[in-house]
UniProtKB/Swiss-Prot annotation:
GO MF annotations, alphabetized: neutral L-amino acid:sodium symporter activity
Membrane topology: Multi-pass membrane protein
Lineage of the organism: Bacteria, Bacillati, Bacillota, Bacilli, Lactobacillales
Pfam families: SDF (PF00375)
A biological-process GO annotation: serine transport
Primary subcellular site in the record, as a coarse category: membrane
Source organism (scientific name): Streptococcus pyogenes serotype M5 (strain Manfredo)
A GO cellular component annotation in the UniProt record: plasma membrane
Stated role: Involved in the import of serine and threonine into the cell, with the concomitant import of sodium (symport system).
Name this polypeptide is given: Serine/threonine transporter SstT
Top-level taxon of origin: Bacteria
The keyword Signal is assigned to this record: no
Family to which this protein belongs: Belongs to the dicarboxylate/amino acid:cation symporter (DAACS) (TC 2.A.23) family.
């Protein structure tokens, strides 16, 4: 038994997760009635979601309170990359929809309890109100905009505190980080359970009716991950981006794919940034911010499904309208974390550009929920892995400029 344990400890986390995925698929196909097994995945995701707000608050307030005047954090470039990357993803989705026009079979049942925002202004109003949320409520509800804003305020206030107080804050951040390490080490079991749940509840053939839609959505996201993002990276760093891109996809995207939660993946991303050797002053702010506004995958989902609706209803669309759609999708996607239902519930905002009624747009949303098992997984994997990628290339570019 000890030999098996020692062998397990020596195996890398990624290989353990791979083993967990295989076992989860086999159990889902061969023993779908083991419903009690699903609780392990819920506990794993619940643990990550529970610790993530505390981790963000502790790290951000600690980093800002210890920050020396004039220290470089590269946040301006990172925020630009987040916004530009989201817009580029939206533009690629428009081009994909032109090359591979989709039509949808509607009359899909829709959850009537969901209420989409009435426009981009409402999305941003919601985000602004989250800035001034009660700090305790922000932590309890995982409102990362609120957590970030209060962590920054507390960090600035703590700059004038005694060294003993700052040391206490630093210790709290280290303790929280250690708890995160313990939870992440349970990823193979948690992901095995999540894979089992997906296979046992949905089967392997339930999505065959929507195969082309899934292919277009996933293909666009893969193109952005393996072509567009590396192109952005090479323009910034002037070096081969693929080792970093593939590492981000492997160590961040894989976990995000199965948890389907950018919030739950924040601790994973922070640990990866630490392993890469990035500055804590930077990634403690950029990673939770990225989980909120870096939404390339969401922009792809909004545009592909909106243009599928446009093709379904035979609505003509010119280049300028498509460009405007990309802007609206990018802006809306940045607010996806502030909307219940995420990117899918922002589709009516984009559909309104073409005069598509809310009732019809919500039927498109219904189609989105049907393919959501795969769409949401790929979307989260792209969004979350890009948070680390853009943080890393911004810091890399800074050091190259400094050496020049």
């Amino acid at each position: 038994m000890k030999k098996i344990y020692d062998l397990w400890v020596r195996v890398s986390l990624i290989k353990k997760i791979g083993i967990g995925v295989v076992i989860g698929v086999m159990l889902g196909i061969l023993a779908p009635d083991l419903t009690g097994f699903s609780i392990l995945g819920k506990l794993f995701v619940g643990g990550l979601k529970a610790i993530a707000p505390l981790l963000v608050f502790a790290l951000v307030s600690q980093a800002i309170s210890h920050q020396k005047k004039g220290r470089q954090t590269n946040m301006t470039l990172i925020i630009f990359l987040y916004l530009f990357g989201t817009f580029a993803s939206a533009l690629v989705a428009v081009l994909t929809a032109y090359l591979f026009p989709l039509t949808l079979v509607l009359n899909t049942p829709v959850n009537t309890e969901l209420s989409p925002p009435q426009g981009v202004a409402e999305v941003f109003q919601s985000l602004l109100l989250k800035l001034v949320d009660n700090p305790i409520n922000a932590l309890a509800t995982a409102n990362y905009i609120g957590v970030l804003s209060w962590a920054i305020i507390f960090g600035l206030a703590l700059k004038a505190a005694s060294q003993e107080t700052k040391h206490l804050i630093k210790t709290a951040a280290e303790v929280t980080s250690q708890i995160v390490v313990w939870i992440i080490n349970l990823a193979p079991i948690g992901i095995m359970s999540l894979v089992f749940t997906t296979i046992s509840e949905n089967g392997v053939g339930i999505l065959s009716d929507y195969a082309f839609l899934i292919l277009v959505l996933v293909g666009t996201m893969v193109f952005v991950a393996l072509v567009v993002n590396p192109l952005i990276a090479v323009l910034i760093t002037r070096q081969n981006p693929y080792p970093l891109v593939l590492r981000c996809l492997r160590e961040s995207g894989l976990t995000a794919f199965f948890t389907r939660s950018s919030a739950a993946n924040i601790p994973v991303n922070m640990q990866l940034c630490q392993k890469i050797g990035l500055s804590k002053d930077t990634y403690s702010v950029s990673i939770p911010l990225g989980a909120t506004i870096n939404m390339g995958g969401a922009a792809i989902t909004i545009n592909v499904l909106t243009l599928a609706a446009v093709h379904t209803f035979g609505i003509p669309i010119d280049f300028l309208t498509a460009l405007l759609l990309s802007v609206v999708a990018a802006v809306s996607a940045c607010g996806a974390s502030g909307v219940a239902g995420g990117s899918l519930l922002l589709i009516p905002v984009a559909c309104s550009l073409f005069g598509i009624s809310n009732d019809l747009a919500m039927q498109v949303v219904g189609v989105g929920f049907i393919v959501g098992v795969i769409q949401d997984s790929c979307e989260t994997a792209l969004n979350s892995s890009t948070d680390v990628l853009f943080t890393a290339i911004a810091e890399n570019a800074f050091w190259k400029r400094k050496k020049a």
